[in-house]
UniProtKB/Swiss-Prot annotation:
Region described as Disordered: 94-122
Gene: rpsM
Name of the featured protein: Small ribosomal subunit protein uS13
Quaternary structure and partners: Part of the 30S ribosomal subunit. Forms a loose heterodimer with protein S19. Forms two bridges to the 50S subunit in the 70S ribosome.
PROSITE patterns named among the record's database cross-references: RIBOSOMAL_S13_1, RIBOSOMAL_S13_2
Functional description taken from the UniProt entry: Located at the top of the head of the 30S subunit, it contacts several helices of the 16S rRNA. In the 70S ribosome it contacts the 23S rRNA (bridge B1a) and protein L5 of the 50S subunit (bridge B1b), connecting the 2 subunits; these bridges are implicated in subunit movement. Contacts the tRNAs in the A and P-sites.
InterPro entries: Rbsml_uS13_C, Ribosomal_uS13, Ribosomal_uS13-like_H2TH, Ribosomal_uS13_bac-type, Ribosomal_uS13_CS
GO biological process, one term: translation
Gene Ontology cellular component annotations, sorted alphabetically: cytosol; small ribosomal subunit
PANTHER family, A to Z: 30S RIBOSOMAL PROTEIN S13/40S RIBOSOMAL PROTEIN S18, SMALL RIBOSOMAL SUBUNIT PROTEIN US13M
Species: Hyphomonas neptunium (strain ATCC 15444)
Amino acid sequence: MARIAGVNIPTNKRVEIALRYIHGIGPSFSKEICEKVGVEPSRRVNQLTDAEVIKIREAIDAGYMVEGDLRRDTSMNIKRLMDLGCYRGLRHRKKLPVRGQRTHTNARTRKGPAKPIAGKKK
């Protein structure tokens, strides 16, 4: 198994698919990385040489924010909004939808499981 950006990449998959196992790399980034390094996207990971794996690893480290750095940056951005006290920050703080979705019904994913209310029998 090749290890890139702290993630074990599956060896039996194509390179462009296997790179998507890294948090922060999607379809377009994986194709871009393959182009930049000069690796054919349809090749399998187990067919790559050690030099090619090192090139891919260096390309990802040099140009992309992935895995822990990306997660940390995202959480710091949310924390900054909460500290500012802006509308989006308040919505994050109250664990409600941030982007204008309705909350009267729905929003169960964001709000969590429904809390039973006493005296609501019919």
